[in-house]
Each structure stands twice: as structure tokens, then as C-alpha cells.
Amino acid sequence: MDEVISGYRTVTGKAPVMPKWAMGFWQSRERYTKQEELLSAVSEFRKRKIPLDNIVLDWQYWPSDKWGDHNFDSVRFPDPDGMIKTLHDQYNARLMVSVWPKYYVGTENYEAMNSKGWLYKRNVEKGQKDWLGFVSTFYDAFNAPAREAFWDQINTKLYSKGVDAWWLDATEPDMCSNLPMDERKALMDPTALGPADEYFNA
């Protein structure tokens, strides 16, 4: 068996051991709507002496009409740097943030990605709205420069603040999950690698 495992590692490469905190308890819910709600949840875990290593901040931490700009809503999350510092220093907890390859039409990052031709066009051309009522699209993650731009966006706006982990959400990509599969593929066609029929959910 050791030979099989070592042979597999030869093919895949050596996997680094995750940090100890990543193996502990993670608290997650549909979302925390504001900074004080998230900090209060962690505080309550500590008061009750329930072990907690990571808390997940799911979607809609951004302004409601700015999906894809990767900014915290300044009303609901007035001090994200302070929030993350409190999690780290006062509560010895880590923060995971969900990020999506999705952009609302007209946002700053949408315009930047669109100007390079890195966004799928069909959903915008059809004026198809998401479940919150906005027209959006996804970037082509098969395109290497687009991936670099996406990383630069989330690194500058989020990781640099001290975010510890990413939840890379909707990477299927899930523009409209209730549509027939042929239309879902058409929404992301073509990719930088070729037809969506071949690379959908790759």
C-alpha cells in the first residue's frame, strides 16, 4: 500500500499539511448580515466555551447592487479591518469569505473585465436577472489573464485585510442553475479553452 500512496504522490505532488486551525470547528450559516452579528456569534462561542476556529462570511457582505466589486458594504460592515483584527487578536479565530466569479453589469470590476473581453456575454445580452433582480455574468476562469485579474481584485480588496480562507463559490459556473443544461452551457460559451460542451464544470 505504501508503494501505491508514494506512486500517487509522485503523480500529484506532495500535499502540504493544512494549518491546525483549518482542522477545527467551522461556524457557518446562510450569511451574517452585518459586522456586529458576526462578532457577536464568535463572542457567544467564546462565552459558552465552545471551541471555534473559523467563521464563514457567506454572500451579500457587499453593497446590494455591487456583486463582484469585492468590497464590504460600508453601512453593514463599517470597519472590516477592525472586525478581522478583533477575530484574530481578541477571539483567536479565523475568517473565511465567499467569493464569486460573478459581476453585476456596470460595476467597476465588471467594466474592467468586460473591456478585456473576459466575461461571458449571453446572459447580459438576454438581460437575464439573478434571483436578486440584477443582470450579471461570470468571468471566463479558463482564461489565464482573467484569473490573474480576478485574483488581483480579491487580493487587493479582501486578502490584504487579513482574510484567512476563501470559499470559491459558484465555480460551476452557476449563472442560472434552474435552466436546462444546454442553456447553462450556452451561457458560458465559448471558454478560452474551447466549447462549453467540453469544459462545463471542468
Label for each model-derived stretch:
Residues 1-202:
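Catalytic-domain carbohydrate-binding cleft regions of carbohydrate-active enzymes
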